[in-house]
Amino acid sequence: MSRVRLVIAQCTVDYIGRLTAHLPSARRLLLFKADGSVSVHADDRAYKPLNWMSPPCWLTEESGGQAPVWVVENKAGEQLRITIEGIEHDSSHELGVDPGLVKDGVEAHLQALLAEHIQLLGEGYTLVRREYMTAIGPVDLLCSDERGGSVAVEIKRRGEIDGVEQLTRYLELLNRDSVLAPVKGVFAAQQIKPQARILATDRGIRCLTLDYDTMRGMDSGEYRLF
């Protein structure tokens, strides 16, 4: 079963790792998920956390000072240090087994076709994995480019701004993994709206228009005996 813990607390937050970052005292939502991820949220950033730690990570409590400090540490030794000044709400909830996001038929087929014909992304590209799982959901395709660099690909039937935002979240998360980083992004769709293309380009994400009919007609060796 999936258990999520919600805490609303007056707190300060310090990130200690490759960089350092400090969030001064404020009321915040702390979200602890069953996969081990921890995220810190404010009321003004929609779905985006102020800071977070991806799994695997571990939560311990230091109680030697004036206020308890919740320390979230990952395997790389990076830490989120959350100093708790006061707790207004603390609850845990069973969410059950989530069926996951079900892609429509065209998107699922586009993903399968692009995985099979990965050279459409560029010469020298190789497929690492389909549905590469992250703490916030699966990346459609994880690939390597001609230089061995990591590339995350998000595939849509219609490429809109929310798809670019989704890929941006994946990239922010994947680029915190020292094994994969740096990770580039490709936003692939049958049709990409101008606003989505502008946003993607501004964020350094490459756009790729997919011709579904042409891809369906491409030669496949999947069932070939010779």
UniProtKB/Swiss-Prot annotation:
The lineage of its organism: Bacteria, Bacillati, Actinomycetota, Actinomycetes, Mycobacteriales. It comes from Mycobacterium tuberculosis (strain ATCC 25618 / H37Rv). It comes from the Bacteria. It is found in: Cytoplasm. InterPro entries: Endonuclease_NucS, NucS_C, NucS_N, NucS_N_sf, tRNA_endonuc-like_dom_sf. Its main location: cytoplasm. Keywords: Cytoplasm, DNA-binding, Endonuclease, Hydrolase, Nuclease. It is an enzyme of class 3 (hydrolase). Pfam families: NucS_C (PF01939), NucS_N (PF21003). GO terms for cellular component: cytoplasm. Cleaves both 3' and 5' ssDNA extremities of branched DNA structures. Its EC number is 3.1.-.-. Signal peptide: none annotated. PANTHER family: ENDONUCLEASE NUCS (PTHR38814:SF1). CDD domains: NucS-like. This is Endonuclease NucS.
